Amino acid sequence: ITESEYEILSNDGYRFDDLIGRTGIEYAYEDILRGSWGGEMIEVDAVGNFQRSLGVKPSQKGDDIQLTIDLDIQKVAEEVLEDKIGGAIIVMDPRDGAILAIASKPTFDLNFFSRDFKPEEEYNDLFFSDSKPLFNRALNAYDPGSVWKIVTALAGLESGQFPANTLLETSPCIIYGSQCFREHNDLGFGIIGYEDALRVSSNTFFYQVGYGVGVDKIYEISQILGFSQLSGIEISDQEDVGLIANSDWAQSGRGWGNPGETPWLPEDIASMSIGQFVVQVTPIQIAKAYAVIANGGYVVTP
């Protein structure tokens, strides 16, 4: 506890040299885990010699909590990331949202904050490194890319414009606005439906679906799935809500321009349809959305 923290926390029974949870589960459940100090009040004479005990208050240990983490799965997740520059892995039970593993790379020694002495080099590496090891990448927002296509697919299905038996012609390129939006294999996949489009991750199939239903339908479905909002995970103090664009967002200035001067463009919907540019989501949000597909249609809280 720092000096400034002590001024506030001392009212709750903390001492100046106490250790407290700084991040993650230990931060979220600090009140449950911490317990309370005990002590003995004694009477002494003028020179400090013990005379008698006036009372004893026993200390109380904090309560235990049981995590849903599966240690074996957690170890595998961390091993997979070990030789990677950066990334995140989340393993979630789609039936109830239980987190079985969550890993982020780069990471740091969680015992660092409890040390009395913190070497300057280690401190600088932790707080000022370009790799940002303090960021939990499982809870930070990024362009999702092709994993977003399932959202566009649901928007097409729910709109009624692109029912389950829809077949669309894919091609090397489709022009929206002034830009050619390419298929990732530069050839196309012929006439395909949803299942094959997801299997081969066709860009031009989902360009057509997204452009057909429009940005606001994709946005509507994304909100049902839990995007652009906190996932509900207990360690949400570290969580980014991300960004899912819609027509109101574009009309209001996109967060950087003047209202009315940043209209929605055809290029925007093409990019949005495959999870690029105007879509930023977190890995935990993606896991939550895919759980809906896996469990038959209901939203769970991680």
Identify the role of each PLM range.
Residues I1-A88, A103, F108-R137, A141:
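Extracytoplasmic/periplasmic proteins that interact with beta-lactams or build/remodel peptidoglycan
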Residues D45-S53, R95-S146, V151-P302:
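Beta-lactam-recognizing serine transpeptidase/beta-lactamase-like catalytic domain environment
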Residues I89-P94:
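Short hydrophobic alpha-helical segments used for membrane anchoring or interfacial signaling
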